[in-house]
From Swiss-Prot:
Keywords: Chloroplast, DNA-directed RNA polymerase, Magnesium, Metal-binding, Nucleotidyltransferase, Plastid, Transcription, Transferase, Zinc. HAMAP family: RNApol_bact_RpoC1. The keyword Transcription applies. It catalyses: RNA(n) + a ribonucleoside 5'-triphosphate = RNA(n+1) + diphosphate. This is DNA-directed RNA polymerase subunit beta'. It is an enzyme of class 2 (transferase). The gene is rpoC1. In plastids the minimal PEP RNA polymerase catalytic core is composed of four subunits: alpha, beta, beta', and beta''. When a (nuclear-encoded) sigma factor is associated with the core the holoenzyme is formed, which can initiate transcription. It is found in: Plastid, Chloroplast.
Length: 689
């Protein structure tokens, strides 16, 4: 059993038959060795108890009920005074029933069977190691032809080297005639080979270091060859070089991990623990079982039949033995990856059986659904939308999601503040959505961060912490600056929200995972919170108003129609372009819909007179009755007195530019205020505003 405190990683790879035997076999206190599943039965139809040596045998996998054997006897678990520790009548140990979740069994195969993953999957490891075509190896595995087995210093009946095709008519019909079953088996074991046994023999004879040396020599020879000028030949040479590189890398991996290639052919087939392939009783006569149990039953049936043909029968035709070996190979293929070799195995209702590959792989497989992306409590999921008014470290959480995630916290505070007498009353107030519930929820959210995650989580910025704010609707609101870290956009992406419960998790969220603390990329150090997509479009729209200069706008008749207000009769003249003393007046006029976002206006500004070019001539000069006059330039206006003193300076701008300037100014002030506070003691820090 895997202990999460002692095992920090999980590695999937090939195992030896000895390791499978170690996992499955166990020695009972009386010295009897159990672990092999020999019967294709599950439960007895009368007693409704597991069959002995079957797929749910209690001797092999442990008791169904803790401390109770198949006979019904009871022992206290962990009591060393209780003796014996197993039932002498049925052979079942008095242990915890949880052992049935990890105790395995095994099936001893009558003939070696090829593991189909390493033959049919891409890349095919068998093809890479043996350097033979895939169709040739498939015919060999599924008994399509024989492989002549040369024996040194011994006379052989078949004086052939290489492949002896089974489909050749003389051999197909003449060889079985001269031999009985046992004689033919002896002949085949001595001079012929087919099926998974032939692959296993070739893999066992491989010298991995010689493979690396020969492949390297051949690769160097191909590398030194010049181009032939024939595109097809050059591609063929390139594919061969790539194959040699893969072959050398695979051989090095086998050597580095101390794995023998012959382990890719199975002699012992592991049987999963019963709790991972359960059977449920619906009614007295109806059972619901896992598909894996049905495939195991077929494997045991075919394996027992082949064992009987090889051990007991004398005059069984050789073709029947070969056919049974092929059926056994196909049954094991269906267990590992149903349908990978052609027609999948089906039940009586023409439904395809679900194999181990189907259970493991895919989005709903055991790895991604249970181990990597396991569903957890205190979590939710929704679509994300933009929240431009949010702070960088805040997110908008829908009320419906927030009340479900923080329901336990709300109930606690309702009882603590004597607003509810018990849990039932508190839940009733939550269902009625009373105002006090939302007030308490907001108080909780002000001090409790949440984690937002967008799959796939490829780097640490794929999950960040935020302080939630209650929003209407059902969508999670997100600041657009944090989208790059999540690799998210607002075209229907979904994000998951999690609530850190322990103090350690909340401290980690606050100190390490807040979004405003992850502004730089952890890989290259570049800013990760940069304006993109919607923000750039918004900045463009905000600053794309009529600000091209008074000459272009007023005196160019071709452009005049492009710079008009919503009123078609509106034309930019001095009287129609309003003057404002400050930005607040301009914003107020916009809210009263007296000006547009891109309408040009004159704003009084404290402009440094040194930046005004002395040699620049005004475009127009307007004189007033009191002697003051206006000098109008391309982008600014100067109001002078009779004595030519500068009274006011106005700049020609738009409300969009004013808004952008105010945001930048507030951000700079906040930055310097934060830097200033960080240098002061905590007791004299200045609060913003």
């Amino acid at each position: 059993m895997i202990d999460r405190y002692t095992h920090q990683q999980l590695r999937i790879g090939l195992v030896s038959p000895q390791q499978i035997s170690t996992w499955s076999k166990k020695i009972l206190p009386n010295g009897e060795i159990v672990g092999e599943v020999t019967k294709p039965y599950t439960f007895h139809y009368k007693t409704n108890k597991p069959e002995k040596d079957g797929l749910f045998c209690e001797r092999i996998f442990g008791p169904i009920k803790s401390g109770i054997c198949a006979c019904g006897n009871y022992r206290v678990i962990g009591d060393e005074k209780e003796d014996p520790q197993f039932c002498e009548q049925c052979g079942v140990e008095f242990v915890d029933s949880r052992i049935r979740r990890y105790q395995m069994g095994y099936i001893k195969l009558a003939y070696p069977v090829m593991h189909v993953w390493y033959l049919k999957r891409l890349p095919s490891y068998i093809v890479n190691l043996l350097d033979k075509p895939l169709n040739e190896l498939e015919d060999l595995v599924y008994c399509g032809f024989y492989f002549a087995r040369p024996i040194d210093k011994k006379p052989t009946f078949l004086r052939l080297r290489g492949l002896l095709e089974y489909e050749i008519q003389p051999w197909k019909y003449r060889i079985p005639i001269f031999f009985t079953t046992r004689s033919f088996d002896t002949f085949r074991n001595r001079e012929m080979s087919t099926g998974g046994g032939s692959i296993r023999q070739q893999l066992a004879n491989l010298d991995l270091r010689m493979i690396i040396d020969y492949s390297l020599v051949e690769w160097k020879e191909l590398e030194e060859e010049e181009s032939t000028g024939n595109e097809w030949e050059d591609r063929k040479v390139g594919r061969r070089k790539d194959f040699l590189l893969r072959r050398m890398e695979l051989a090095k991996h086998f050597i580095r991990t101390n794995i023998e290639p012959k382990w890719m052919v199975l002699r012992l087939l592991p049987v999963l623990p019963p709790e991972l392939r359960p059977i449920y009783h619906i009614d007295e006569d109806k059972l619901v079982t896992s598909d894996i149990n049905e495939i195991y039953r077929r494997i045991i049936y075919r394996n027992n039949t082949l064992t009987d043909l090889l051990t007991t029968s004398i005059a069984t035709p050789e073709e029947l033995i070969i056919s049974q070996e092929k059926l056994l190979q196909e049954a094991v293929d269906a267990l590992l990856d149903n349908g990978i070799c052609g027609q999948p195995m089906r039940d009586d209702h023409n439904r395809i059986y679900k194999s181990l590959s189907d259970v493991i792989e895919g989005k709903e497989g055991r790895v991604r659904e249970t181990l990597l992306g396991k569903r957890v409590d205190y979590s939710g999921r929704s679509v994300i939308v933009v929240g431009p008014s949010l702070s960088l470290h805040r997110c908008g959480l829908p009320r419906e999601i927030a009340i479900e995630l923080f329901q336990a916290f709300v109930i606690r505070d309702l009882i603590r503040k004597h607003l509810a007498s018990n849990i039932g009353v508190a839940k009733s107030q939550i269902r009625k959505k009373k105002p006090i519930v939302w007030e308490i929820l907001q108080e909780i959210l002000d001090d409790h961060p949440v984690l937002l995650n967008r799959a796939p989580t490829l780097h640490r910025l794929g999950i960040q912490a935020f302080l939630p704010v209650l929003v209407e609707g059902r969508a999670i609101c997100l600041h657009p600056l944090v989208c790059k870290g999540f690799n998210a956009d607002f075209d229907g992406d979904q994000m998951a929200v999690h609530v850190p419960l322990s103090l350690e998790a909340q401290a980690e969220a606050r100190l390490l995972m807040f979004s405003h603390m992850n502004l730089l990329s952890p890989t290259i150090g570049d800013p990760i919170s940069a304006p993109t997509q919607d923000m750039l479009s918004g900045l463009y729209v905000l600053t794309s108003g009529n600000r091209r200069g008074i000459c272009v706008n007023r005196y160019n008749p071709c452009n005049r129609r492009n710079y008009q207000n919503e009123d078609n009769n509106y034309k930019y003249t001095k009287k129609k372009e309003p003057f404002f003393c400050n930005a607040y007046d301009a914003i107020g006029a916009y809210r009263q819909k007296r000006i547009n976002l891109g309408s040009p206006l004159w704003l009084r500004w404290r402009l440094d007179q040194r930046v005004i070019a002395a040699r620049e001539a005004p475009i127009e000069i307007h004189y007033e009755s009191l002697g003051t006059y206006y000098e109008i330039y391309g982008h600014y206006l100067i109001v002078r007195s009779i004595k030519k003193e500068i009274l006011y300076i106005y700049i020609r701008t738009t409300l969009g530019h004013i808004s952008l300037y105010r945001e930048i100014e507030e951000a700079i002030q906040g930055f310097w205020q934060g830097c200033y506070n960080s240098m002061l003691p905590a007791r004299i820090r200045v609060s913003p505003g």
